[in-house]
């Protein structure tokens, strides 16, 4: 399927209309007609990394040059361990060296780390410049490029420093997924499964039937998975941009998952891998609280297993998990707020989880030594 599909993120209820479009399809990197309305000064900074630059940077720069758009590239090291102040300053250095002005947009060409760093730089440089997301991983196309969360990690906690700052446009070129390593593809599927679990039981059913086609990168299957994921996220973000309510449900599995990433060291586990194990922990806790059935947890585990994702966390002591989870962004009045499942297709927040049940989950859901 080569037809382009579009999803609107409606953010027009505030003083200024910050709505934008997500375009999904094949070979969108060269669809400069989609980019030009957001390049008023005919100059742009392209932020990418050492992995993506050899694959797609010149393709994008050449297409822009044909329309007289001047660009320069900022090539960052690749990896979650580089999502920090030092790497962020590399972007600021380049923007200042090229005397970029407030109308100079930043284009994020890469995965979630590139997008988060570029967005935070755009939110901060000159107190705000435009930016565009061109995500090249499945995880970024279905999740991190949409919704305006930007930021960096701190040694004590993931994504603890950042800003809400919306892109002007998202171009999800599914053709870039052909060069994505299998491990990265599976990590992105973890976030796709999340959308079915929190919001759409029919989508979860569809994923059960189409997992092998997704893993085989069938274009039509992939485009539908991306579109449906973006539709769900756009709907939730439009209702709650700054995560004061329903948007927190998008963090299913992330309280446990961030603890895994932080404790094991950024980059040891891919974000999607940690979310997968964390989602199984959340499902186990939901079962112990009698919110969902054993049959539900079995279905969830089987789907993650069929995607080739971890269903057990690393062997960290419950105490270390708890220590890391206390630094979660959703902590309120000192209490950890968990996203739990009420059924497949519906989730809710709970800040009254008994410590004993939580410890049981943490003991049951880690790999054997």
Curated annotation (Swiss-Prot):
E.C. numbers: 4.2.3.4
Reactions accelerated catalytically: 7-phospho-2-dehydro-3-deoxy-D-arabino-heptonate = 3-dehydroquinate + phosphate
Name this protein carries in UniProt: 3-dehydroquinate synthase
A Pfam short name: DHQS_C
Protein family per UniProt: Belongs to the sugar phosphate cyclases superfamily. Dehydroquinate synthase family.
GO-annotated cellular components: cytoplasm
Natural source organism: Nitrosomonas eutropha (strain DSM 101675 / C91 / Nm57)
Keyword Metal-binding appears in the UniProt entry: yes
Spans traversing the lipid bilayer: none
Gene: aroB
Taxonomic lineage of the native organism: Bacteria, Pseudomonadati, Pseudomonadota, Betaproteobacteria, Nitrosomonadales
UniProt-listed PANTHER family: 3-DEHYDROQUINATE SYNTHASE, 3-DEHYDROQUINATE SYNTHASE, CHLOROPLASTIC
